[in-house]
Amino acid sequence: IIATRPGHTINNKFARQLRKEIRMHEIQAPVYNCNEEPLMDVNRIRELLPHRYPFQLVDKVIAIGANYIVGVKNVTSNEPFFQGHFPQEPVMPGVLQIEAMAQVGGLLVLNSVDEPEKYSTYFLKIDNVKFRQKVVPGDTLIFRVELMAPIRRGISTMKGYVFVGEKIVCEAEFMAQIVKNK
């Protein structure tokens, strides 16, 4: 790259854009094989999360590591939110994409404790949300959520991505708290 009239401002803009492009290429979509047995199915997820239909937004978990988790949601045309959002052109609401990502993050945090059935997670904060593409009936959402820092005093900070195929459709940073049930 040769610059004819470089200056501080333009160099900064170029460096920011270059960093953004590099980051986007570093993030790889998780590999999902629908024929493989999941690590957690919908019944196991029900044991850990208090959410029920129509608000249980995670169908299965296909990978769990020390600081990451990969979950799946199959979006169908029978989802109740499509009745009003939008009848002629159904689009999954962004807030529900975030909620689904938070539920996957909750499963990651619960996976870090003994006897996870005795704990609950609560969504505290969300930052840097970006929606990049519409989610429509027939899409399979793949969630990858990773811890940004170790869990301290029951508080976890996470970064999550939602993929449809190889494309990132949503990303966010969020915080959750894990609390022992009474």
Description of each model-found segment:
Residues 61, 92-116:
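Active-site helix/loop of acyl-thioester processing domains in fatty-acid/polyketide metabolism
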Residues 52-92:
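Catalytic strand-loop segment that frames the active site of acyl-thioester-processing enzymes
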Residues 30-39, 105-144, 169, 176:
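Hydrophobic beta-strand-centered segment that forms part of the acyl-chain substrate-binding groove
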Residues 3-46, 169-182:
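Segments adjacent to and within acyl-thioester-processing domains across lipid
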Residues 20, 71, 143-144, 158-160, ...:
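Hydrophobic residues positioned within well-ordered beta-strands of beta-sheet architectures
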Residues 75-77, 149-151, 164-166, 176-178:
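Beta-strand elements of well-folded, non-transmembrane domains
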Residues 1-4, 61, 126-165:
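Hydrophobic beta-sheet segments that form the core/acyl-binding groove
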Residues 42-52, 118:
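Short aromatic-glycine motifs in intrinsically disordered, low-complexity regions
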